[in-house]
Amino acid sequence: MLPTLTALLCLGLCLSQRINTEKQTLPKPIIWAKPSIMVTKGNSVNIWCQGAQSASEYQLYFEGSFFALERPKSSRSMNKVKFFISQMTSHTAGIYTCFYQSGELWSESSNPLKLVVTGLYDTPTLWVHPGPEVTLGENVTFSCHLKTATSKFFLLKERESNHIQHKYGNIQAEFPMGPVTRAHRGTYRCFGSYNDYAWSFPSEPVTLLITGEVENTSLAPTDPVSSLDYWEFDLSTKESGLQKDSAFWDHTAQNLIRIGLACIIVMALVWLLAEDWLSRRKDHEKLNRLTSWECRGRRRMHRYHEEEQRDAISMRELKATPGDM
């Protein structure tokens, strides 16, 4: 009995330790691209992945498949690494994620980084009607035209990730807005595309002005630029500090597993104790039955001897009676 209980306890402790190790996950890393997530065809880009200070290895995945591996170069840069893409093409545009390892544990996957290549098609033309100066409450429509046939158009507002719109079209797409508010003012560009990550050159900027407001020179049209460094659209996670839950552990799952494991061990112990008690009870009942049978046998033998003695006495008395007569 004691060896069995000891073996069960050891098994429970080993399983608990193994499950505890497997369920521990490191906090997800952050991922970003420099100089931008929108890269002109042929240009280079760096993809950064930042994890915990104790990270020993980083892995980059592209469209769900392993892409590259990097290890921190020095102790001062243990918490981040750089993955270099020398030439951006339509084959390197898409969704990237990264992981890092610390000890025997691997982190969760980072948020997806959507890397876009531009400059694959002609430059589209963007205009707004009416405009570019409109009054509050008025309806406007942005039109994006591309000579080369495409399937999708994107309209982007400068520095606003939540203001990315897309429309399907062949050579032109319309983006209606309104009634306009002060939130609509700003500078817009459009792109043509055959998919979400391979875009044309950007259009010339078009600035939407709202009348009745104080003039803001920062919203005035700018000269065309050859790179998109100025257009840092947050299509994915920006560079920032590591998440506050850097010591995040799935306590709820661990506790539930421990409780379940403890219940199984307790049930096993109860079952063993019940089996032992039933076995002892059966042995005791068997012993009682044997003892009872022995007592009955002794009583029967005792009665038999008594009867033999009485019979012998009776026989002697019968033999003695005729002689006396």
Swiss-Prot record:
InterPro entries: Ig-like_dom_sf, Ig-like_fold, Ig-like_Receptors_ImmuneReg, Ig_sub, Immunoglobulin_dom
Record Pfam families: ig, Ig_2
Free-text tissue specificity from the UniProt record: Weakly expressed in spleen, heart and lung.
Disulfide bond residue pairs: C49-C98, C144-C190
GO biological process terms, semicolon-separated: defense response to virus; detection of virus; immune response-regulating signaling pathway
SUPFAM superfamilies: Immunoglobulin (SSF48726)
Domain Ig-like span(s) in chain numbering: 42-100, 137-192
PANTHER family for this protein: MHC CLASS I NK CELL RECEPTOR, NATURAL CYTOTOXICITY TRIGGERING RECEPTOR 1
Full protein name: Natural cytotoxicity triggering receptor 1
